[in-house]
C-alpha cells in the first residue's frame, strides 16, 4: 500500500485542522480578500490589469473580448475559473462602483439596478488612463517581479501606483475573522491631502479635513455629519451616514408634490429601493405616497414618489430616511495589508504608507535610470576615444581576420573595455562624420548631467519628495474634478463619542498570539478559593494560550508597554468587546509600529495625567527606573521609548506611584522579594537605562512582578501550580535597592515557581487564568494571611498539564449586583478544552 521509502508522520486531527484552517485563513487574508495599502488592489484585480497590459490594451488601443482577457489571466497568472475572474473585471469597469474605473468596458456591464452583465464572450474592454498611472514605470525595476504560479511567466507583487488608488477607489472584502470597507475619495482632494503630509508629516486630522472633507462616492449622495468621517480618519473605523439626493417638485396641477430622487447612496440597488418603498406603501408605513415610478434614463437617475394631496412632503421624507435605504450607514473599516500584515489604519497612516511606497519606487526607478545612463556614458566614452584615433583604429580593424579578432586587437592596442569595443565594431560609417561626433559629445555631456542628478536624488530625501510633489501636481492639473458627494454638517452628530459610553468596569485579555478583547467584569462570578473556575477563554478559537489579563474602566487611558521598552497609548473603549469565549482581534490592529519579536509586557490604566505622579518600570534582569508619568501623556502613534533595554533583557512591569509613602516590591521567579522606598530611585529621563533594583540568585532567576505597596496592605503571592498565600507587607523587611532580598514563599514541586504577586485587601478579588483558558475569581476574604516563609494554600484546582499564566486584582464594585458569590459545586459545569 505504501512505498518502503515513505515516512508517515502521525498527527492529532484537531491540531492538524486548527493549523490547516489557520493557513487557509492567512491565505485568504493575504492573497485574496484584502487590498495592498500601496496600490489598493487585491491579487485578482492586479492580475487582470497586468494581463491586459501584456495584451497591450492601452486606452488608445482597440477593445478586446473579455473572454480573451479572462482566459489569459486564468492561464498565466490567476489559476481560477474564468467565471470567478470575470466579475472582478466587470466591477473595475462599473462607474457606479468605482470612483475612477480602471477598465473601459464596451457592452453590457450591468447596471445600478443590479442587472447582471452580458456573458464575457459578448463584452470587450481595455485599460483606462487611471490603470495606466498605476502601472507606469513597471518596466523600470520599480517593484519586485516574481514567478507566476507555475513559473512559466513573471508578475509584479505590487504596482508602482502613481496615485493613492486605495483611497481613491476604496475597497471592500471579507476575509476570515476580519473585513475591510474603505470609502472612495476625490482624487484632487486626496492629492491635496498627500501634498499636505509631504510638507508636514505631523499634520493633524483637522488639517487633513480642511483639504479633504470626506469620502466622495461615485453615486453622489449626501453625507450627514462629520463625526463619522472624523472617527474613520482618526481610528480607521467609523459609521458614515449617507443619504440619497432628493428634492421636492410641484405637480402641474399645483395641488400635489412629488419627491424626486436623483442620486443614490453608495452600494444601494435602485430597483430594490423602489421595491422596498412600494412594499412600505402597501403596508401603510408610507401611506402618504400615491405612486412610485422609475423615470431613469441615459441622462441619469430619476425616481418619482408622488405624494397624496394634503400630505406633508417633509414628514414623508423623514419616514423614508427612517424606514428605507434612502438613508444608509456606511460602516468604514480601513483595513488593508501593510507589509503583508492586516492593519486597521488611520487616514494619516494610509497616506503615509503610500508616500513611503512611492519613495521606494522613485529610488528604484532612479537607480535603474542611473545604471542605464552610466552604461550608455561608458559606451560614448569609447566612441569619443575612438574618434581621437580613428585612422589607427580603422587600420587595426581592417587588418583583423574576423569580428572576434578585431575586438581583441582594439582592446589590447587602444585600452577599450569589451562593451566599448563591441559598440565600436557595430558603428555605421556615417556616425564617424564630424556632425555625428558633435552629437556624441553633446549626448555624453547630457548624460553626465543626468548621472549627477540621479546620484543626488539617491542621496537627498528632499529631492525624492520634490519628485513626488511634482508628479502629484501634474496629476492635479490634468485630472482635478468636482466632488460628487456633498457633506451636510449636523450639530446632533458632532459630539464626543465618550458621552454615549458607559464608564463600566471591564476585563482586558491578551492571548498568546496577541489577540485582545474586553469583557464586562460581571461575566465572572466570585468563587471561594479551591474552586474549578469557569471558561474565561476558548482555546478552540486558535489563540494557543492566554498571556495576560487586566482590569480597567472603559473611559480609562491605557499605557501599553512592550518587552522592547516601547510605550503606546489607547482608550479602553477602543478595544473590541467580546464574549467570554470570544478570541478578540489582533492587538497589532490598534498599535502602529510594532516590530518583529515585539510583545506586550504591561498595561497600565490611568484615569488622567493631571498631577499623576511617577511611572516605575522593571525588567526581568532586575533593572528599574522611575520617570514622571506626564512624560507619557501624548505618545506618538508609533509609540515612544519608555526604557533603554540592554541586550538579553526585556521590560516586564510598569507601576504607578502616586504618594511618597508608597514602597517598591520586586518578586523573583525563585521566590525572593525585595522592598525599598521609591525615593531610593531618582527620577530619570524617558530614554534612560535605569539602575539595579534587585540582585538575582542565578541565571535561572528573573523578576516576575514589580508592585507598589503601602504598610497596611498584604501581598498575595501566586505560584504557577495553583498555590499561593497572603503575607503582610511589613513581614518583608525594608532593604536598599539592589539587594538579593528575603524569601517570599517556599519553592518546591507542589507549588512550582512564582507567577507573580499583587498587593490586596479583604475588599479585593483576584482573577486567575490558566494556559488552557480556565478562569477563577477569588475574594481575598477567603484567603487568610500567613507567614512569609510558608508554603501557602491551594487557590485553584488545575487540570493535569495546566498551569497558571496570569493574575489580576479586581477592585470591589458595590453597584455591580451581578457579581455573586458561589460555591465550588456551582461551577461543576466547567468546559474541558483539552
From Swiss-Prot:
Its EC number is 5.6.2.2. It is an enzyme of class 5 (isomerase). A motif (GyrA-box) lies at residues 527-533. One of its GO terms (molecular function) is DNA binding. Keywords: ATP-binding, Cytoplasm, DNA-binding, Isomerase, Nucleotide-binding, Topoisomerase. Residues 34-500 form the Topo IIA-type catalytic domain. Few gyrases are as efficient as E.coli at forming negative supercoils. Not all organisms have 2 type II topoisomerases; in organisms with a single type II topoisomerase this enzyme also has to decatenate newly replicated chromosomes. This is DNA gyrase subunit A. It comes from Chlamydia pneumoniae.
